[in-house]
Amino acid sequence: MFPQSRHPTPHQAAGQPFKFTIPESLDRIKEEFQFLQAQYHSLKLECEKLASEKTEMQRHYVMYYEMSYGLNIEMHKQTEIAKRLNTICAQVIPFLSQEHQQQVAQAVERAKQVTMAELNAIIGQQQLQAQHLSHGHGPPVPLTPHPSGLQPPGIPPLGGSAGLLALSSALSGQSHLAIKDDKKHHDAEHHRDREPGTSNSLLVPDSLRGTDKRRNGPEFSNDIKKRKVDDKDSSHYDSDGDKSDDNLVVDVSNEDPSSPRASPAHSPRENGIDKNRLLKKDASSSPASTASSASSTSLKSKEMSLHEKASTPVLKSSTPTPRSDMPTPGTSATPGLRPGLGKPPAIDPLVNQAAAGLRTPLAVPGPYPAPFGMVPHAGMNGELTSPGAAYASLHNMSPQMSAAAAAAAVVAYGRSPMVGFDPPPHMRVPTIPPNLAGIPGGKPAYSFHVTADGQMQPVPFPPDALIGPGIPRHARQINTLNHGEVVCAVTISNPTRHVYTGGKGCVKVWDISHPGNKSPVSQLDCLNRDNYIRSCKLLPDGCTLIVGGEASTLSIWDLAAPTPRIKAELTSSAPACYALAISPDSKVCFSCCSDGNIAVWDLHNQTLVRQFQGHTDGASCIDISNDGTKLWTGGLDNTVRSWDLREGRQLQQHDFTSQIFSLGYCPTGEWLAVGMESSNVEVLHVNKPDKYQLHLHESCVLSLKFAYCGKWFVSTGKDNLLNAWRTPYGASIFQSKESSSVLSCDISVDDKYIVTGSGDKKATVYEVIY
């Protein structure tokens, strides 16, 4: 078939110089395979060797990074210590005699003069120590010596800190570590140290200069832009004045809340002094104003005039909006300073500053006292108050904080720290004695521990103040229920499906399981048409609702009927009921009467069985212990009283200097939170004289409710704020700003939802985020 192909002779003669046979080809292929196999084996050995070297280099990388990081930490720690000691010296020297002042000043100046020879010795010692440390980790990468006159590339001369930084740069440079965030931080930090006159200034320490210099940096300009945006967001409340409804008169017996006072805005998660913002003398105050109820409330005259504004509530989970009437820190003006309730002995501001300056962070884990970029002091109240406080107290984060530290905070705590956030310059002046509020350049605290003898001390928050199971992160508004009248009472069903809102002459029922529903599922007309509902309570079975308000009768509604209906009415001698409470067994109802009595009703027989008499003015709020044995009531006579329900007698009485508008008893026992007309929230221990006093509200506290887990509670006020607090010391968990006075609130049994009723004729539903 293939005669030409089977005739090999011409091909061999013409094109092939050797004989082509199959065995030879196989031998040649075998030789080539063996050669490739040997080459593969050689490459494999080389690859394994490179992998081993790579592992070794990674070990060196980690070792030198840790050394460099540790040196950076130590350098900043020593720098901060030097600044604080310099500040203390500057404060103490004026107390010396003139002769000693000069001697001490000269000694301080001599101590600042570090010669190049001393720096060379320091650098040499540090390098030798680093080499000794590296011997235990395999052959060290050789360290390049840095003469005293030469600086590492890209880093400006750093004065007295050159030795440490030169060493850390040598370590990182030889192992090819380009840690840009660290270098930026060093440049920013030491640029301030290099300012002319800084090292020779005794009376104006470096820590006081840093903030003025930072004002020219990009972080400060960004902060100003952020503030302007916040100001625009907040100023639209004021522009809604033309759209506000007519004044609504609410008949509320014997109430007399004062009008909102000038109160400050500050970072609620911090409770201490902000050393970074000492003496910002040139800081310009950007105009900002916040909406608060435009009218005053009068319970004494039986009228509560609410000038409300129709605007969407704005949730601010961190910082209240700044007020334009607040003084800039560093100035002597202190408008809005209110006299304190207690009068503790005067505290020497010099001693205070020294003590505050020498404090260390309360909650910084890890091998070093504070991460780089942080100001390592806890202030008077422990600014490092949250999980993220290990790297930044969330609101007091240094603008030079590196990305590595931020990432570490996220990994460790699951929350992204608010990098670059700077609190507004308008500092709050809370209701505290001037000697506590007036710490020079200090950021006012808002949580104070008050001892039995009236001593007030800012509270250092523990490291788990804002973390842990059952502690929310923030709250998100998910629904608005347009009731149509001022909502003075709200309650949530169990399980969470229906919300009941009490307004003028009726209670409306809303189904919140379908967020799209914008209209109530039913309306319960009760009391008189023009009388406001002041309280409504569901029995645990969810089938009975009790309603009280500006009438002498309480309405009992049967919700299990095909159409809700009134199944009974309870009539008392008092003209109004301000608050209701139900016993855990659902057998008894307690009503706070405008005449000061506490009426006890038998719900089964629908009769009045007892009255607790003691309040000399209207009883405004009430709560009952979980075991049903103890009742707590607050009154317009400035007292909080506890009652033994088994024996029918008064147990305790707490006297205050302000009317009591709201209270709540912690479900887990021991703590009672009280909301005041004076804008304070006080948390009392039921068996001890000690208490906590909280100062974030700017006007009277109108309602208060504990979460069912007992770990936190919320309060609302005439200042349009909803505040969430940690039990009992009052670390601020989150804060929401609504568009009008927030008159009432409730928390669902599963602690997942909060409902508030406000003066702009609506209720707001929040989802609690954990």
Swiss-Prot record:
Modification after translation:
Phosphorylated, probably by CDK1. The degree of phosphorylation varies throughout the cell cycle, and is highest at the G2/M transition. Becomes hyperphosphorylated in response to cell differentiation and interaction with HES1 or RUNX1.
Q: Does the keyword Ubl conjugation apply?
A: yes
Q: What is the effect of changing S715P?
A: Abolishes HESX1 binding
Question: Where do we find the motif Nuclear localization signal here?
Answer: 225-228
Positions annotated as WD repeat: 470-501, 528-558, 572-602, 614-644, 696-726, 737-767
UniProt xrefs under Pfam families: TLE_N, WD40
Q: What are the entry keywords?
A: Nucleus, Phosphoprotein, Repeat, Repressor, Transcription, Transcription regulation, Ubl conjugation, WD repeat, Wnt signaling pathway
* Listed SUPFAM superfamilies: WD40 repeat-like
- Protein's recorded name: Transducin-like enhancer protein 1
Q: Residues bearing Phosphoserine? A: S239, S259, S263, S267, S286
Decide whether keyword Repressor is in the record: yes
> What happens when you mutate Y532H?
Abolishes HESX1 binding
Function in brief:
Transcriptional corepressor that binds to a number of transcription factors. Inhibits NF-kappa-B-regulated gene expression. Inhibits the transcriptional activation mediated by FOXA2, and by CTNNB1 and TCF family members in Wnt signaling. Enhances FOXG1/BF-1- and HES1-mediated transcriptional repression. The effects of full-length TLE family members may be modulated by association with dominant-negative AES. Unusual function as coactivator for ESRRG.
- Example of a GO cellular component annotation carried by this entry: transcription regulator complex
State the domain notes.
WD repeat Groucho/TLE family members are characterized by 5 regions, a glutamine-rich Q domain, a glycine/proline-rich GP domain, a central CcN domain, containing a nuclear localization signal, and a serine/proline-rich SP domain. The most highly conserved are the N-terminal Q domain and the C-terminal WD-repeat domain.
- For region Disordered, the annotated ranges are 128-157, 176-348
Molecular function terms, GO-annotated: DNA-binding transcription factor binding; identical protein binding; transcription corepressor activity
